[in-house]
Amino acid sequence: MNLMLALTVNTLLTALLTIIMFWLPQLNSYAEKANPYECGFDPLNPARIPFSMKFFLVAITFLLFDLEIALLLSLPWALQTANLPTMIKTSIMFITILALSLAYEWTQKGLDWTE
């Protein structure tokens, strides 16, 4: 009996909430709600607007350096390895490549946003 009462109450409550869900949005309908929203872009404008290649290159550079930093995060746990000299040489080589790539990006004006 208790189980039957709980199932009935749950079913009625679900039906009531479903009816309210379909009925309530029709009360406050206005033109702005009917328009599609796509992340701040106007869907009626042409989709092929000019894209800043500088922004794209900075974004790709950020992703590459972010990935390299994520690989460096495991370095403290790697210090517990049995083959410590190899791990240190590899880490120093990795950090050197990271620093050289940053210096190259800097000298090629890849990090300048003002141009």
Swiss-Prot record:
Its EC number is 7.1.1.2. InterPro entries: NADH_UbQ/plastoQ_OxRdtase_su3 (IPR000440), NDAH_ubi_oxred_su3_sf (IPR038430). It is an enzyme of class 7 (translocase). GO terms for cellular component: mitochondrial inner membrane; NADH dehydrogenase complex. The chain crosses the membrane at residues 3-23, 55-75, 84-104. One of its GO terms (biological process) is mitochondrial electron transport, NADH to ubiquinone. It holds the Pfam family Oxidored_q4. GO terms for molecular function: NADH dehydrogenase (ubiquinone) activity. Its main location: mitochondrion. It is found in: Mitochondrion inner membrane. It is a multi-pass membrane protein. Keywords: Electron transport, Membrane, Mitochondrion, Mitochondrion inner membrane, NAD, Respiratory chain, Translocase, Transmembrane, Transmembrane helix, Transport, Ubiquinone. It catalyses: a ubiquinone + NADH + 5 H(+)(in) = a ubiquinol + NAD(+) + 4 H(+)(out). Coiled coil: none annotated. Core subunit of the mitochondrial membrane respiratory chain NADH dehydrogenase (Complex I) which catalyzes electron transfer from NADH through the respiratory chain, using ubiquinone as an electron acceptor. Essential for the catalytic activity of complex I. Core subunit of respiratory chain NADH dehydrogenase (Complex I) which is composed of 45 different subunits. Interacts with TMEM186. Interacts with TMEM242. Belongs to the complex I subunit 3 family. This is NADH-ubiquinone oxidoreductase chain 3. The gene is MT-ND3.
